[in-house]
């Protein structure tokens, strides 16, 4: 079984759905489509890690696999990215994605890219389905950009930040 199938299978085994009724592979494919659109922004090594991490970005958070499981199935670089984008424990969204969480993303090569792939896919789907999540993402986008270091450490990903912001303005 290849890594893409393995990632999808882990979500299937835990009955994990996207928007309550879609197989989770739907979201992973959307995130991968974003990766394919922007992979030219990455160097070759990071491109390989991010390509794998996009498929596995929710594994540790949403399925019954550990960092070591991910490392053994994908590789250490992808596992480090997936670990970085995994929400912290918390009682609400703000606690799960606090300063420490975003610091870990900023400090892990490739993690900002993968987080942007995930967020863009979620916003695209939210816009298409008229989900209430779309408005939440729109409201928090300015802070999200700051947390990810748009104007400081991640200027090379500017086309992704612009694309995301434009989704809210179309």
Predicted regions and their residues:
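Active-site helical microenvironments for divalent-metal-assisted chemistry
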Residues: 1-170
């Amino acid at each position: 079984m290849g890594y893409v199938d393995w990632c999808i299978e882990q979500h299937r085994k835990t009955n994990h759905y996207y928007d309550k009724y879609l197989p989770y592979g739907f979201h992973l494919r959307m995130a991968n489509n974003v990766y394919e659109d922007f992979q030219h922004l990455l160097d070759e090594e990071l491109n390989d890690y991010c390509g794998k991490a996009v498929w596995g970005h929710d594994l540790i958070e949403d399925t019954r696999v550990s960092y070591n499981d991910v490392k053994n199935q994908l590789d250490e670089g992808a596992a480090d990215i997936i670990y970085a984008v995994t929400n912290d424990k918390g009682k609400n969204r703000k606690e799960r994605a606090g300063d420490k969480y975003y610091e870990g993303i900023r400090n892990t090569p490739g993690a900002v890219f993968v987080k942007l792939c995930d967020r863009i896919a979620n916003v695209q789907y939210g816009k298409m389905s008229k989900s209430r999540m779309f408005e939440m993402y729109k409201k928090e986008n300015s802070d999200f950009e700051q947390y990810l270091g748009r104007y400081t450490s991640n200027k090379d990903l500017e086309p992704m930040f612009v694309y995301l912001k434009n989704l809210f303005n179309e």
